[in-house]
C-alpha cells in the first residue's frame, strides 16, 4: 500500500508540473544535408535554432549527416539495434560558446540521407528509441526534457503509410510503462507524417484520439500543396488539450535550400 501511495504521489507531481507550452519547437524535413557543404545544417538549421526567435527543440527528418563541427560526446545510448549518437554543436565561438545537443540516428545505412535527428538547447534527461512499426519503416527517436518527451518521426509515403501506427506506438509506449514517471509524461511527435491531418485523425483508434490532439498549420507544408508536416501532442493516461498552435516558419522558408518541405513551428497561442 505504501509503495502504491508513493507511486501515485510521484505520478501526480509530474503531471502537475508538465507543460508542453514551455517549449518552442519546430519540425523540418531537410531532404538531405547537401553532404559536401552541409549547407542546410550550417545555414538553415542554424537559423532555426539560434538568434532571437530560436526554437528550443527541432525535429529533423531526412537529416543527411550531422555537421562536421559537431563533437560526439561518446555517450552510449541503448537502442534496439539502431545506432544513436549524442553530439554537441557550438554555434558560436570558443570564447563565447552557444551549444546545442544533436541526437542523431543513422537510419539510412546506405545512402545516408534519410536519417533522423533532434536538436535541443538542453541536454536530454533521457533518450527513447522505438523500433519501426512496419517492414521498411523508420524508428521513432525521442528525448525527455524534464516532464515532457519529444519525438521526430518520418512516416512511410504512399499506400504503406504507417503514420497512425507511429502515433499508436508512442501512446502505447507510455501507457504500458511500469514507471509512473513515464506514464505521466506529456509527449509530442513532430515530423513528416506523409498524410493530411484529418486523414491521420480518422485512422487513429478511439483511445488514442481521446488522449491526443493534432496541431497543424492552416497552410500547405510541402510544394505539392499538401499539409504533411505537423505535431501530435498527447498524454497516455491524463490528457488535457494544450493552447498550442502551428505555423510555417517563414523566415527559414525564404532562405531554405532545395527542400520541398517547409519548416513548421509549434508554440503557445
UniProtKB/Swiss-Prot annotation:
Q: What is the effect of changing residue 261 to A?
A: Loss of DNase activity, no cellular distension, no G2/M cell cycle arrest
GO MF entries: endonuclease activity; toxin activity
**Assembly and oligomerization:** Heterotrimer of 3 subunits, CdtA, CdtB and CdtC.
List the keywords (alphabetical).
Endonuclease, Hydrolase, Nuclease, Secreted, Signal, Toxin, Virulence
Primary place of residence?
secreted
Any extra remark in the record? Answer: The operon of the strain O128:H- / 9142-88 / EPEC is referred to as cdt type II (CDT-II).
What is the protein name given in its UniProt record? Cytolethal distending toxin subunit B
Asked if Ribosomal protein is a keyword of the record, the answer is no
Q: Which InterPro entries match?
A: CD_toxinB, Endo/exonu/phosph_ase_sf, Endo/exonuclease/phosphatase
What lineage, starting at the top, does this entry show? Bacteria, Pseudomonadati, Pseudomonadota, Gammaproteobacteria, Enterobacterales
Instruction: Name the job this protein performs.
Output: Part of the tripartite complex that is required for the CDT activity. CdtB exhibits a DNA-nicking endonuclease activity, and very probably causes DNA damage in intoxicated cells. This damage induces G2/M cell cycle arrest, chromatin fragmentation, cell distention and nucleus enlargement.
Q: List locations, semicolon-separated.
A: Secreted
Which branch of life, at top level? Bacteria
Top enzyme class, one word, equals: hydrolase
EC number assigned by the record = 3.1.-.-
Any signal peptide, and if so, which residues? 1-18
Record's GO cellular component terms? extracellular region
Amino acid at each position: 500500500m505504501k509503495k502504491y501511495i508513493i507511486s501515485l504521489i510521484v505520478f501526480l507531481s509530474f503531471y502537475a508540473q508538465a507543460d508542453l507550452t514551455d517549449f518552442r519547437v519546430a519540425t523540418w524535413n531537410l531532404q538531405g544535408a547537401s553532404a559536401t557543404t552541409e549547407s542546410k545544417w550550417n545555414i538553415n538549421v542554424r537559423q532555426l535554432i539560434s538568434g532571437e526567435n530560436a526554437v528550443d527543440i527541432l525535429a529533423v527528418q531526412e537529416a543527411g549527416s550531422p555537421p562536421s563541427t559537431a563533437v560526439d560526446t561518446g555517450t552510449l545510448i541503448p537502442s534496439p539495434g539502431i545506432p544513436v549518437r549524442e553530439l554537441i554543436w557550438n554555434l558560436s565561438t570558443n570564447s563565447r560558446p552557444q551549444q546545442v545537443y544533436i541526437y542523431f540516428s543513422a537510419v539510412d545505412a546506405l545512402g545516408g540521407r534519410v536519417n533522423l535527428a533532434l536538436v535541443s538547447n538542453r541536454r536530454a534527461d533521457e533518450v527513447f528509441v522505438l523500433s519501426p512499426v512496419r517492414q521498411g519503416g523508420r524508428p521513432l527517436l525521442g528525448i525527455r526534457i524534464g516532464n515532457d518527451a519529444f519525438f521526430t518521426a518520418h512516416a512511410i509515403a504512399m499506400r504503406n503509410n504507417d503514420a497512425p501506427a507511429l502515433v499508436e506506438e508512442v501512446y502505447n509506449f507510455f501507457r504500458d510503462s511500469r514507471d509512473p514517471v513515464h506514464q505521466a509524461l506529456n509527449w509530442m511527435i513532430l515530423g513528416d507524417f506523409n498524410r493530411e491531418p484529418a486523414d491521420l485523425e480518422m485512422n487513429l483508434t478511439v483511445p488514442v484520439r481521446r488522449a491526443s490532439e493534432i496541431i497543424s498549420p492552416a497552410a500547405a507544408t510541402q510544394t505539392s500543396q499538401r499539409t504533411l508536416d505537423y505535431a501530435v501532442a498527447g498524454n497516455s493516461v491524463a490528457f488535457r488539450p494544450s493552447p498550442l498552435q502551428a505555423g510555417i516558419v517563414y523566415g527559414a522558408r525564404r532562405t531554405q535550400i532545395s527542400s520541398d518541405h517547409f519548416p513548421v513551428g509549434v508554440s503557445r497561442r
